[in-house]
Amino acid sequence: MQLTNEKVDIVIIGGGCVGSGIALDATLRGYSVILLEKNDFASGASSKSSKLVHGGIRYLEKAIKQMDKAQYDLVKEGIKERSIFLKNASNIAKKLKINIPIYSYLKLIYTYFGLLIYKLMAKNKSLGKNSFVNKVVSILFSPNIKQENLKGFLSFYDGSFLDFRMIISLLQTAVSKGAIVKNYCEVNEFLYDVNNKISGVKYFDKIKNKNYEINAKVVINASGANVDNLRLKDDESTNEILALSSGIHIVVSKEFLSSNEGILLPNTSDGRVIFILPYMDYCLIGTSDNKTVYEENPKAQEQEIEYLLKEVNNYFEKHLTKEDILSSWSGIRPLVKSDKSSTEQMVREHIILKSKNDLISIAGGKWTTYRKMAEDLVSFLIKNKLLEKQKKCETKRTKLFGNDDIKELEKLISFYPISKKTKNSLKTLYGSSCIKVLNLANETDNFELINPNLPYLKAEIEYCIKEEFVEKPIDFLARRVGLCFLDKKLALSCVDVVCEEMGKILFWDEKRVEKEKFECKENINNYF
């Protein structure tokens, strides 16, 4: 067992959106922070979202129908946080126009006033004007939409983003301010002082194959769907707080959507809504919402896929089949238990708990409110005298890594021998940091592509190892460039090249390279 000599203020367990957000908030306030993630960063539900930064139009409908103030407050908070999100991560998050197909004039009036309330709630934080276009114009936008009884499209604006890139940006920003973040480090035991209060953790580093101990003033459990498992490890008598919900998404060719605007399907057979969204030159469809149990690597189930296909096909002339699916995935939402009969009805609010041994756990919430969740948690630590107050929260005005003005770099980027497709891909994935990738490619005189049918440079592999915490090939293919979320077959076609390039950089022997190829292909096969 190796011991760390230094005692830190905070150990965070979990490298998803909440853990990463807490790492940044706490570091900016002047605390020493170590974040430990048992797999890769964003390997859980945080990379398996609908990629929306939204106030929650569907939560507003529930608030009105059920006269539910909690749902209303969630929308209000979401709209406020959406504005901060888009400002601080403008390289990753963009506004998106979303169209709602309308098939009756009564529904037109109902939806129009719902969107009006949504816009009025946003006040000066609105992203754009709501609008209505008739049937003819709607069909021009979406030729495949079901035309019988179509009255037109009602449109509104929300935000969209690359969730896995947001995690990396948060972590890079936190590290630049002094945080230490480690992936593939699994906490397997808590340390306790003479008063039986938590004083640190024991963890196993899967890359170095070593056990370590670290002492801390506070240990935060931000492990998402695993929150209850860690709470029970601390206190076997504790009550579980999570109601786990699975949500799947499928990806098909962008031709199905035929525009850069999203579509919201407002009336499904079970009262949910489904989003069909442009996503990195593909089309993303989701989501489902079903009770589930904790699973390390959940996979989209047959019945969930059939549900999405059936509901989507009700709205389109040309039907989707399973053969059209290029990738699919399942994420587990860590919702907080309530008296609601279904997980879909549960309010997406968050909760912070302190155990009798001072383990601090946070659960619930949603991607859009990750920053507020982090702020609330660090403020909770100060209020409960677990940490001495230092600085105020600064995350409302902290621009994230890669968010410098890309326009100033455009001329410089144009000098490099890359295609327009590669240039756009680099800007989308790395923002202003794309110039670092290009400089690295230039230094090694290697502008070779990983695959001639894809925009990714081999130099991106080395950059992501040096700058973005990549330890395994699946980290790169799934959660740095996102290819696994787009096209499983294309991702599989890149495995050998990525493993061999990583082998050269990290000095793997042939046996290790072959082992990584096998493991990576097994992982990718989880994507449909």
Label every PLM stretch briefly.
Residues 9-35:
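N-terminal Rossmann-like FAD-binding beta1-loop-alpha1 element of flavoenzymes
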Residues 6-8, 208-218:
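Core beta-strand elements of the Rossmann-like FAD/NAD(P) dinucleotide-binding domain
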Residues 51-141, 274:
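Dinucleotide-binding Rossmann-like beta1-alpha1 core, especially the glycine-rich loop
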Residues 28-49:
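Glycine-rich FAD pyrophosphate-binding loop
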Residues 13, 214-224:
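Short hydrophobic core segments
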Residues 229-250:
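Glycine-rich beta-alpha-beta "Rossmann" dinucleotide-binding loop(s) and their flanking helix/strand
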Residues 183-199:
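A conserved short coil-to-beta-strand element within the FAD-binding core of flavoproteins
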Residues 25, 39, 92, 99, ...:
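C-terminal accessory subdomains/tails of enzymes that are appended
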